């Protein structure tokens, strides 16, 4: 029944939380659950709603961690930031987190969903060509993928970004 589903969702969120928390403490990184237990769901398909006009009150976590204009940021509604891991890896300040938003039918080119975000501080514009799922904004080089953040790939994704700087 519904009770079991809710119980499972809570257990699942707690398990995710522990995975991220353990990874952060193992490597001496900061961890912020942010909106990590906001009834968080794993969307494998695109999520859209038919909403033409939306007034957004930004979550403080979105303001703090996801204050960018380029896709997947700055679009849609119900923007959420969850499970933020931040620190220095090989002397490179970084942040990694799961980002979610609900897309709008009026803008099919920017589908909503769940994104795994890794970004590094990068004071100068990157010298190399960025691939599709990357952008440079506000002194950060950012790369995003579909799905929840996976701790197993954070370091390799940072290494990949470092090569572009």
Residue positions per predicted region:
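Transmembrane-cytosolic junction motif
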Residues: 2-27
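Generic hydrophobic/packing signal
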Residues: 20, 49-52, 154-157
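Hydrophobic, Leu/Ile/Phe/Ala-enriched alpha-helical segments that form helix-helix packing faces
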Residues: 20-28, 158-165
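Short glycine-aromatic motifs
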Residues: 26-30, 37, 133-135, 139-140
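Solvent-exposed, non-transmembrane helices and loops of integral membrane proteins
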Residues: 28-48
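Short Lys/Arg-enriched alpha/beta "domain-start" segment
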Residues: 33, 46-61
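Structured extramembrane domains adjacent to transmembrane segments
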Residues: 56-165
């Amino acid at each position: 029944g519904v009770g079991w589903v809710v119980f499972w969702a809570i257990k699942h969120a707690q398990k995710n939380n522990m995975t991220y928390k353990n990874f952060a403490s193992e490597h001496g990184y900061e961890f912020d659950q942010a909106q990590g237990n906001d009834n968080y769901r794993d969307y494998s398909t695109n999520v859209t709603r038919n909403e033409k006009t939306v007034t957004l009150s930004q979550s403080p976590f979105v303001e703090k961690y996801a204050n960018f204009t380029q896709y997947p940021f700055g679009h849609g509604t119900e923007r959420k930031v969850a499970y933020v891991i931040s620190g220095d890896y090989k002397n490179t300040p970084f942040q990694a987190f799961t980002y979610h938003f609900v897309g709008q039918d009026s803008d099919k080119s920017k589908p909503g969903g769940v994104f795994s975000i890794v970004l590094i501080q990068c004071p100068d514009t990157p010298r190399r060509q960025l691939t599709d799922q990357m952008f440079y904004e506000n002194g950060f080089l950012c790369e995003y993928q579909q799905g929840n953040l996976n701790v197993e790939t954070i370091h390799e994704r940072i290494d990949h970004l470092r090569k572009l700087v």
